[in-house]
């Protein structure tokens, strides 16, 4: 149907229907359109009855070659899809608002509605209109939601499309996750809202279904919708009935008890899983045979990465452009198959914390790179393999077409060659992959022996079954071939008999076969010709002989098409019955694709195999940022070392000017650790990586305007999350803590954060802490495990050169004016800044901080050039009471934090007086 803006008349029609009120018995359709059911036409009564059953969906109601929408659905769809709003006589005084889309293009329109958060119920004609007595029977055959769409054209083949089911019971959460396009299904249980939020951020489902208690659990549902674009639907309580959920799972997996599935101890997880399968059965209207297993997992077995850290580290997409290029995944992904791409993404989003499993992956990569010719040959055989996971899902759904089966067979034909190469490998993981990879030769033979090499896309147009597979198919085809010969002979005889040389036998689906005579020769038409159709320049006729021949030919053709479809459906079902074997093989192919990709990336980029330890040591020599070194074109990336342990080198305070490379250095350390724990080689000369349980980052600053949070509030919220959840096995990347507020507040907060982290009883995490508060370098030697580092800078007169090298010690200058000059700030401003900094140089708060700290080791480096907020308190104020207060301070008994708080209070007093 033509896309266009609604006319004023159409808008008025919609408004009238919204406002109309009927006095007779009514039935409310969707959101506020009363319909007088007593006067509706029979067809519209059926529509309203169906709509009432699926009131939370937009109903696509099949009428001939269109899906039509009526009443409120029509108003919504015409607005969202920008299609014409018309009207339909429905038995009432006013025409019902109506719009429609062609059935052959429906998926495109459905997906546009799904992307906007709507559900769509598809109501099909389930009987042949020619055979129907009265109204054609219609049924809703599927409900499409964001987490249950099957349209491969709209889905990203490199990303799973997850549906998540959550049940909140007391202070616990049950969580089940499924991707119906691949058959994957998992369940877990969590005891805190933050842990649940971490899982949501990890899987980023398209849709969440939940009980009402989840909405009150403390998880910010509005944030899930706004920030992640997740559709959240609360289901009726009966979905979460414990007994019903257990019964549903037992029936689906054909087991007598759930212990056999390994999920018997997951009480809330069982409820979440049962609700998920109830929802899928209701929406999909099918047996879901491809969802043949459910796997329990513990979130504690994977590295925890919160949403902020995922965003800051740009694991799968960049922060600004939201695109793959420029992310870690972009560097690592050289996979050949869609299955491999999805698996690699899951590896990046879920790094391991089991050292033994990590070593297995690293061992597979090492052997693949030791045999590069075999690795490259494997990749060549992987290249033509289609998406086996999503193909078998379509086969199980009975939506796969003949070409899908041919693609499936051509993919399976690659497996024996891959297995032959893998037979020469000895690493445990590659040997396991070879064992799990079933060549599926019986399925290949079935498809190749039954389906033609180039079948049509449609399932009911014939031309599907290979010659020799079925005797009846061959017989009907011969009849059809002979029929064409008979038609040709009849045409020749009629030309001879009538003298009409241009006479032709034509065919169309509506009128069947006919004799076509142009108007020039219609005077020569014999009396036994019966007029059938009038055209602009010709007439079409039928004779008894042609009618008899038509019945014979079309009868054979109809039987042929019906038989071919029946045989194709049977073949498809036979393939679908092997879903477990196929899915296991698909997983093996995907894993092999990932390891071959990671091995190739490691070889091309001079990555090294990291050593994995469980002592907490992180020792990286000449580490490089995996993404930045790919993005810079002509410049050489400057490598840097990182050394962190659980004792004397736990916290590195890093100072230096903006643009010098502090953030890049810290991010590269986090990425190298993460890469090692997904089982990848890393960009360094050598790396000894102690397994970390969590990576937290607090990098950059940005307002969260959508939730009304300032830069500083966002920063403090993230810091609070880190301090609450970091452990002694965590890695923290903290950049410019406290810069979103006043200098004293910011310095105090940053100082207190470092004190908290350094306390092994409270935290003890390994930390890289970048700051402009040079005063924090005073903590070296005073707090256990704190060490100072800075970015080396070379001065050339008034200019500076960033050397991008991390060196021991603290920075002695901020170089703010030089950076401003590099950024293009006007010369007049630069000159005035130089004058001011000289005037303010005596206002050195660092000296005050030094006086307030306890006796300590001699510092190697001093600092100057402080900002306006760091002016001496005594340059302008002569108030005797303030002077007396300072005189009476017992400085030797003050802690650093007490001293800073006193300074802060004194400053406030002065501000209030001036």
Go through each PLM region and give its residues.
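Acidic, low-complexity intrinsically disordered tails
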Residues: 1-39, 826, 830-914
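Conserved catalytic alpha/beta cores of large enzymes that bind or transform nucleotide phosphates
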Residues: 205-213, 219-222, 234, 545-578, ...
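Charged catalytic and DNA/RNA-contacting regions of genome-maintenance
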Residues: 2-367, 376, 383-396, 400-492, ...
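Charged, surface-exposed helical/loop "interaction arms" that form contiguous linear patches used
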Residues: 397, 401, 411-414, 467-468, ...
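Amphipathic heptad-repeat alpha-helical coiled-coil/stalk segments that mediate oligomerization
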Residues: 240-248, 252-255, 303-307, 315, ...
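ATPase nucleotide-binding head domains, primarily ABC-like/P-loop NTPase cores
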Residues: 71-74, 266, 336, 344-347, ...
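Active-site phosphate-binding and catalytic loops of NTP-dependent enzymes
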Residues: 123, 146-155, 287, 423-429, ...
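Amphipathic alpha-helical transducer elements in NTP-driven molecular machines
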Residues: 40-44, 60, 71, 100-110, ...
């Amino acid at each position: 149907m033509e896309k266009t803006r609604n006319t004023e008349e159409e808008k008025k029609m919609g408004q009238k229907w919204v406002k109309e009120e009927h006095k007779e018995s009514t039935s409310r359709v969707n959101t506020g359109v009363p319909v007088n059911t007593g006067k509706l036409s029979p067809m519209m009564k059926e529509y309203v009855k169906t709509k009432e059953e699926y009131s939370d969906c937009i109903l696509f109601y099949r009428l001939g070659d269109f899906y039509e929408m009526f009443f409120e659905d029509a108003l919504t769809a015409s607005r969202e899809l920008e299609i014409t709003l018309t009207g339909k006589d429905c038995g009432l005084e006013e025409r019902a608002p109506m719009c429609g889309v062609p059935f052959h293009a429906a998926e495109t329109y459905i997906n546009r509605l799904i992307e906007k958060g709507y559900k769509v119920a598809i109501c099909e004609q389930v009987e042949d209109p020619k055979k129907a007595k009265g109204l054609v029977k219609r049924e809703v055959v599927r409900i499409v939601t964001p987490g249950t769409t099957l349209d491969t054209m709209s889905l990203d083949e490199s990303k799973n499309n997850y549906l998540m089911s959550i049940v909140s019971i007391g202070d616990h959460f049950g969580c089940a996750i499924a991707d119906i396009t691949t058959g994957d299904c998992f369940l877990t249980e969590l005891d805190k809202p933050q842990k649940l939020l971490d899982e949501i951020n990890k899987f980023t489902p398209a849709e969440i279904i939940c009980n009402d208690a989840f909405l009150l659990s403390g998880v910010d549902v509005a944030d899930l919708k706004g920030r992640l674009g997740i559709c959240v639907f609360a289901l009726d309580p009966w979905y979460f009935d414990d007994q019903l959920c257990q019964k549903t799972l037992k029936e689906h997996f054909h087991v007598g008890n759930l212990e056999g599935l390994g999920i018997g101890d997951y009480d809330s997880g069982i409820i979440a899983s049962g609700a998920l399968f109830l929802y899928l059965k209701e929406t999909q209207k099918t047996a879901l045979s491809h969802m043949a297993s459910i796997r329990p997992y513990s979130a504690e077995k994977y590295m925890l990465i919160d949403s902020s850290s995922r965003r800051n580290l740009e694991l799968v997409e960049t922060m600004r452009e939201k695109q793959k290029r420029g992310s870690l995944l972009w560097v690592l992904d050289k996979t050949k198959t869609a299955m491999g791409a999805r698996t690699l993404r899951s590896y990046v989003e879920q790094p391991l914390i089991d050292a033994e499993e990590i070593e297995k992956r690293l061992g597979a990569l090492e052997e693949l790179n030791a045999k590069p010719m075999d690795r490259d040959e494997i990749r060549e055989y992987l290249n033509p393999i289609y998406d086996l996971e999503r193909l078998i899902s379509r086969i199980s759904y009975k939506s796969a077409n003949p070409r899908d089966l041919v693609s499936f067979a051509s993919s399976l034909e690659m497996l024996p060659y891959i297995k032959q190469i893998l037979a020469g490998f000895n690493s445990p993981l590659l040997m396991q992959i070879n064992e799990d990879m079933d060549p599926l030769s019986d399925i290949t033979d079935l498809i190749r022996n039954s389906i033609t090499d180039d079948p049509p896309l449609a399932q009911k147009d014939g031309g599907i079954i290979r010659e020799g597979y079925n005797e009846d198919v061959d017989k009907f085809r011969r009849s059809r071939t002979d029929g064409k010969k008979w038609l040709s002979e009849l045409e020749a005889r009629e030309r001879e008999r009538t003298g009409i040389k241009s006479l032709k036998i034509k065919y169309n689906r509506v009128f069947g076969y006919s004799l076509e005579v142009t108007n020039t020769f219609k005077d020569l038409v014999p009396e036994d010709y019966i007029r059938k159709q009038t055209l602009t320049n010709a007439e079409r006729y039928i004779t008894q002989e042609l009618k008899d021949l038509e019945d014979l030919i079309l009868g054979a053709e109809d039987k042929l098409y019906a038989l071919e479809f029946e045989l194709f459906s049977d073949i498809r079902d036979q393939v679908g019955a092997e879903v477990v074997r196929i899915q296991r093989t698909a997983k093996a192919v995907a894993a092999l694709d990932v390891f071959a990709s990671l091995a190739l990336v490691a070889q091309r980029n001079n990555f090294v195999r990291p050593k994995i330890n469980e002592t907490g040591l992180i020792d990286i020599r000449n580490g490089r940022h995996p993404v930045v070194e790919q993005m810079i074109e002509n410049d050489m990336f400057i490598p840097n070392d990182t050394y962190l342990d659980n004792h004397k080198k736990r916290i590195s305070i890093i100072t230096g000017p903006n643009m010098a490379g502090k953030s890049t250095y810290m991010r590269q350390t986090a990425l190298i650790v993460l890469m090692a724990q997904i089982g990848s080689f890393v960009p360094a000369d050598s790396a000894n990586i102690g397994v970390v349980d969590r990576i937290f980052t607090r990098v950059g600053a940005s307002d969260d305007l959508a939730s009304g949070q300032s830069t500083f509030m966002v920063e403090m919220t993230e810091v609070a999350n880190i301090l609450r959840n970091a452990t002694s096995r965590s890695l923290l990347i903290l950049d410019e803590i406290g810069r979103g507020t006043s200098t004293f507040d910011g310095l105090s907060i940053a100082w207190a954060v470092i004190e908290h982290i350094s306390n092994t009883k409270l935290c003890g995490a390994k930390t890289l802490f970048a700051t402009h508060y040079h005063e924090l370098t005073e903590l070296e030697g005073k707090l256990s495990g704190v060490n100072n580092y800075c970015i080396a800078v070379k001065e050339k007169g008034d200019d500076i050169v960033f050397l991008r090298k991390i060196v021991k010690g603290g920075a002695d200058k901020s170089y703010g004016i030089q950076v401003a000059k590099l950024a293009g700030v006007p010369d007049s401003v630069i000159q005035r800044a130089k004058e001011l900094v000289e005037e303010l140089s005596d206002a050195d708060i660092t000296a005050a901080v030094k006086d307030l700290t306890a006796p300590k080791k001699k510092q190697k480096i001093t600092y100057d050039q402080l900002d306006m907020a760091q002016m001496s308190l005594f340059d302008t104020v002569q108030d005797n009471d303030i002077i007396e207060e300072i005189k009476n301070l017992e400085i030797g008994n003050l802690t650093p934090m007490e001293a800073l708080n006193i300074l802060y209070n004194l400053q406030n007093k002065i501000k209030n007086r001036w």
